[in-house]
Amino acid sequence: IHRLWLKGEKRGERDIFIDQLPALPDNLSFNDRDKFWVALVSLRDAQFESWASKIWLRNILAGLPVSAFDSMTHSKFGFAIALDLEGNVVESLQTSAGSIYSITSVNQLDDDLYFGSLTMPALSRMKIR
């Protein structure tokens, strides 16, 4: 995940906010105080990793419907992390129970987290305090 500075001395500069994530990030939200929530849609896959340097293959794959990747990417594993303002992981939420998976968004509203997914038929909510 890269960070682009919008204000201050570093305005216009870009740096790495966090890397080497164990899963693929899909969406990022800020709780307006001290945490960035990152939805991790799928665990990393060695096959996908090997395709990263093959631009021609990535272009072909980008044109396929999401459903073409369901069997490879959408395990019944739910994963989200919270980062502090410096990019350090301060919370890690994981489940393999299958109740929530393929998380594409995490939003905090007061003491609740709301999880969204393109493949699940409903929104999920979790108390955090």
Regions found by a protein language model. Name each.
Residues 1-129:
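Sequence-structural signature of mature extracellular/luminal beta-sheet repeat domains
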